């Protein structure tokens, strides 16, 4: 299933962990990346976290909140997302908000007390393999 802008055809995909090296070498990393989905925003589907070999979980935001991914039924699925990778500092308030979106416990949310410098992806388009028909979307609320 596709979400957001169309992914350019014949685009070579990169593993998530390759983004850091691309940023270091070229100053930025724009392209098609692939990874396995760990979780998605339970509120509206405006972000997902993905994993890749030899790298911590990284967050993928949907560019300008222009589209959303399913809130459930996508964990463990392979995804391709087209967009930009960059490093950014997430404020304490934003981290807490994201934890709330993920359904974290109050103890987990309260434990956040310092900004976090992280690798972030901003996706213009997303493809998720094998999304079941009727997967809950934000519009299903």
For each feature predicted by the language model, list its residue ranges.
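OB-fold and OB-like single-stranded nucleic-acid-recognition modules
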Residues: 1-141
